[in-house]
Amino acid sequence: RLFKQYFAIDAYDVSYSRFDGTESKVFRREVFERDADAVAVLAYDVKTDEIALIEQFRIGALNDSDSPWLIEIVAGMIDGNERPEISAIRELKEEIGVSISEDKLLRICEEYATPGGASEKTTVFIANTDLSGLGNHGGLDVEGEDIRVFKAPLTEAYKQIGLGRIKNAVTILAIQYLLIEKEKVKQIFR
């Protein structure tokens, strides 16, 4: 382990079997490590065709030419031995104040955002939610969160991707998935 504070950096000396059957040379790579994997949840109201989005400060976007305040979907770390579904339900409550049961979750994929240098895997869900009582603020003070919560029509959120306003990869993935598979998702949530 080369470094450990809020995050960690580990170094690995690795080799692998190449596609041509030979063994690669041993090489060193540093990997940005998280103590746990993550979940991301697109809260979707089937009745209104709206989604819940959040806006929060992100240190990784500090030098972004527009703003370090990013528009995202609900996301967070998996605690201990929690199943991803339980983490998703907890994060929905913590970040946007919405409570759901596990049968309202649809797992759409698992993804590695930056596997060339980071180990974090995110399980992505769509949640069948009623957004009629959605508040405008969320997050946990103990986690340093100050989250603006808002609703957007699905098609308007998609337009914000093209305008460069939504820059978070897992958010883009979830919105695009829902647009492509909306009829299937609606059938599942009936």
Predicted ranges, named:
Residues 99-108:
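A short coil-to-beta-strand element that immediately follows conserved catalytic motifs
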Residues 9-11, 53, 124-126, 149-151:
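Conserved hydrophobic/aromatic beta-strand scaffold that supports enzyme active sites
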Residues 85-97, 126-127:
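Extended, acidic-biased charged interface segments
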Residues 17-19, 45-47, 57, 127-132, ...:
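Short loop segments at secondary-structure junctions
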Residues 32-33, 42, 50-90, 112, ...:
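Conserved Nudix-box catalytic region and its N-terminal flanking loop in Nudix hydrolases
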Residues 2-48:
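Acidic, metal-coordinating catalytic segment for phosphate/diphosphate chemistry
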Residues 14-19, 114-135:
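Active-site-adjacent beta-strand/loop module that shapes the phosphate/pyrophosphate-binding cleft
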Residues 61, 66-69, 80, 107, ...:
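Nudix hydrolase/Nudix homology domain
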